Amino acid sequence: MQRLKQQQQQQQVMMQQALMQQQSLYHPGLLAPPQIEPIPSGNLPPGFDPSTCRSVYVGNIHIQVTEPLLQEVFAGTGPVESCKLIRKEKSSYGFVHYFDRRSAGLAILSLNGRHLFGQPIKVNWAYASGQREDTSSHFNIFVGDLSPEVTDAMLFTCFSVYPTCSDARVMWDQKTGRSRGFGFVSFRNQQDAQTAIDEITGKWLGSRQIRCNWATKGATSGEDKQSSDSKSVVELTSGVSEDGKDTTNGEAPENNAQYTTVYVGNLAPEVSQVDLHRHFHSLGAGVIEEVRVQRDKGFGFVRYSTHVEAALAIQMGNTHSYLSGRQMKCSWGSKPTPAGTASNPLPPPAPAPIPGFSASDLLAYERQLAMSKMAGMNPMMHHPQGQHAFKQAAMGATGSNQAIYDGGYQNAQQLMYYQ
């Protein structure tokens, strides 16, 4: 009986320890009680009180939608006081004013993302642009790996434990009306922004662990002011302006197939062109056609053969983001690839040096390995003599053409020869 009690006590202690360990992953700001009435994700300023609002903003409206049709659709959630449609060339937007707040809230919850003429509309609270603080001179951080249920309000609650947090926005897809899985948070004080990056990265928000970094190039060196004329972070990434109007640009990098270049920032001074090529080649995102590094400025570019490959490289590059001890920042290059640019894939980079073996040793071994694969033989990697076979292959290939087997191409073995 005594032994059973001891086992139960041990189990309780273990459960308490596990609970404490789990809670340590959460930031105090993430443990805030849920709101009584959820606020949908969108362009909503922190501190905005929807209980005083009876109007909704409607964006991404198909050009065939008329004002009477828009009013008819939104009248389904409650009596409409007035409706205004503002027509644009590619997509329109409008405002619907209800007699009561509950009808407006129901419209947001039930109509956001619904399709009109095959195009999903965006519905959110309408507000005057003066209700949002000007954050153009604030310090902005990027927040990635957001779960689909995270809203602007949840994101702001998470970071509002820092006194100078001024704004928080989740980016959402123009076509689907869904979260794009990342957002931006603004701070009046640079130190608060840096502390947030250090403390909240890896913490849980919703169902995922989030990651944080500076949203602009050069932020860690004090050059973190936005240098995008008067455009906000939201305009530049999601096509939504400060006043809730649609500014979608079909030529934005994510929408333009001519963009095939990845910008890589925050590179360590010792990172060379070969190092960057080797890192992105190891990701296996696609065919690399050009690699450039500005070592004195700490950034570089990697050009792929297609837009899709470049997009995948950005995603993977920000996931596997450390090179020479620094966390890289990957995004779209500033210019599209000129039409008619010839496709010339780069040969695979030379393998990284291994202590005890020279580059020529590695090249010779790779050549022997490739030849054995082509002949249907077992790779020398399984040779019982191990490194002896490695050295033997290297010595036997002295003076001959050297080759690298590109293991990234599983369907077609390629030999890239060097004199």
Curated annotation (Swiss-Prot):
Residues 54-128, 139-217, 260-335 form the RRM domain. Heterogeneous nuclear ribonucleoprotein (hnRNP)-like protein that acts as a component of the pre-mRNA processing machinery. Functions to facilitate the nuclear maturation of plant pre-mRNAs. It comes from the Eukaryota. This is Oligouridylate-binding protein 1B. GO terms for cellular component: nucleus. InterPro entries: Nucleotide-bd_a/b_plait_sf (IPR012677), RBD_domain_sf (IPR035979), RBM42_RBP45_47-like (IPR050825), RRM_dom (IPR000504). One of its GO terms (biological process) is mRNA processing. Keywords: mRNA processing, Nucleus, Phosphoprotein, Repeat, RNA-binding. The keyword Membrane does not apply. It is found in: Nucleus. The modification Phosphoserine is found at S241. One of its GO terms (molecular function) is mRNA binding. SUPFAM superfamilies: RNA-binding domain, RBD. Transmembrane segments: none annotated. CDD domains: RRM1_PUB1 (cd12614), RRM2_PUB1 (cd12619), RRM3_PUB1 (cd12622). SMART domains: RRM. Interacts with UBA1A and UBA2A. Residues 217-257 are annotated as: Disordered.
